[in-house]
Curated annotation (Swiss-Prot):
Superkingdom assignment: Bacteria
Protein name: Large ribosomal subunit protein bL17
Family: Belongs to the bacterial ribosomal protein bL17 family.
Paired cysteines (S-S): none
GO molecular function: structural constituent of ribosome
The entry's keywords: Ribonucleoprotein, Ribosomal protein
Gene behind this protein: rplQ
InterPro entries in the cross-refs: Ribosomal_bL17 (IPR000456), Ribosomal_bL17_CS (IPR047859), Ribosomal_bL17_sf (IPR036373)
GO biological process, one term: translation
Subunit text: Part of the 50S ribosomal subunit. Contacts protein L32.
Keyword Ribonucleoprotein: yes
Cellular component GO terms, alphabetical: cytosolic large ribosomal subunit
């Protein structure tokens, strides 16, 4: 019986699942918006939100804990220099999951995962042709 067991296995071994969630966390911190399946998005939220809470207090111990989870020095630096201060006053709820239709091949429910309060990306102004 799997009563009260709050983990989705996602049809993967534990090492594969850990590596996948680590890679997805790094991608989310790098791009601040990713597209994935809905169950993966819900599991990703459980990994990312505690890391951002950890990054609110910049200590060597917290950086080491984050590095143990992410294994990417650049993402740990971004987490503690940009994301931690950005969400310093927000008491949780750093990610937003938006349903994004269904995948063409297997009809899997898709979702967008984004960090809330992320800066809007403005497109580069088109260079006007010289007259």
């Amino acid at each position: 019986m799997r009563h009260r067991h709050g983990l989705r296995k996602l049809n993967r071994t534990s090492s594969h699942r850990l590596a996948m969630l680590r890679n997805m966390s790094n991608s989310l911190f790098q791009h601040e918006l990713i597209k994935t399946t809905l169950p993966k998005a819900k599991e990703l939220r459980k990994v990312v939100e505690p890391l951002i809470t950890l990054a609110k207090k910049d200590t060597v111990a917290n950086r080491r804990l984050a590095f143990a989870r992410l294994r990417d020095r650049d993402m740990v630096t971004k987490l503690f220099t940009e994301l931690g201060p950005r969400y310093a006053t927000r008491p949780g709820g750093y990610t937003r999951i938006l349903k994004f239709g269904f995948r063409q091949g297997d009809n899997a429910p898709m979702a967008l995962v984004e960090l809330v309060d992320r800066p809007e990306i403005t497109e580069a102004p088109a260079e006007e042709a010289a007259e």
